[in-house]
């Protein structure tokens, strides 16, 4: 089980809300979020209710300012704990509906372009474990949580285009 604490003000100040499970709508607990402390587990926090809007991946640690989790603003309206899996495996496809060249991945990939000579992935199948997809290399840019399942096109994981820069396994190493 995980534990995350949201604070309205920077530096862990102001009204706070402690959470240990998924929340589809956090609006009644705080109006803004400027700092977060993750005591245990890995979490995905979302800019809007219903797990929508910008997504941010957080591991155990302290985030005294929303820019520390690469946030664009102080709006956090839903959160989800990410289940831990000991093994990770996914298949990436260069075209929609699992067509074109297929590549298999079992570890982190800091640059999809360097490793597979592609910068667009149009479909993927997560066979084991949870992953974070980043639109830019070196784990930067917009983030998307990938849970086990099929993603026939980039819209299925919430992206506006097929640009994939890097991929990271969700591992709670602490």
From Swiss-Prot:
<dbReference type="GO" id="GO:0005212">
    <property type="term" value="F:structural constituent of eye lens"/>
</dbReference>
<feature type="domain" description="Beta/gamma crystallin 'Greek key' 2">
    <location>
        <begin position="41"/>
        <end position="83"/>
    </location>
</feature>
<comment type="subunit">
    <text>Monomer.</text>
</comment>
<protein>
    <recommendedName>
        <fullName>Gamma-crystallin D</fullName>
    </recommendedName>
</protein>
<dbReference type="Pfam" id="PF00030">
    <property type="entry name" value="Crystall"/>
</dbReference>
<comment type="function">
    <text>Crystallins are the dominant structural components of the vertebrate eye lens.</text>
</comment>
<feature type="region of interest" description="Connecting peptide">
    <location>
        <begin position="84"/>
        <end position="87"/>
    </location>
</feature>
<dbReference type="GO" id="GO:0002088">
    <property type="term" value="P:lens development in camera-type eye"/>
</dbReference>
<dbReference type="GO" id="GO:0007601">
    <property type="term" value="P:visual perception"/>
</dbReference>
<dbReference type="InterPro" id="IPR050252">
    <property type="entry name" value="Beta/Gamma-Crystallin"/>
</dbReference>
<feature type="domain" description="Beta/gamma crystallin 'Greek key' 4">
    <location>
        <begin position="129"/>
        <end position="171"/>
    </location>
</feature>
<keyword id="KW-0273">Eye lens protein</keyword>
<dbReference type="InterPro" id="IPR011024">
    <property type="entry name" value="G_crystallin-like"/>
</dbReference>
<feature type="domain" description="Beta/gamma crystallin 'Greek key' 3">
    <location>
        <begin position="88"/>
        <end position="128"/>
    </location>
</feature>
<keyword id="KW-0677">Repeat</keyword>
<comment type="similarity">
    <text>Belongs to the beta/gamma-crystallin family.</text>
</comment>
<dbReference type="InterPro" id="IPR001064">
    <property type="entry name" value="Beta/gamma_crystallin"/>
</dbReference>
<keyword id="KW-0716">Sensory transduction</keyword>
<feature type="domain" description="Beta/gamma crystallin 'Greek key' 1">
    <location>
        <begin position="2"/>
        <end position="40"/>
    </location>
</feature>
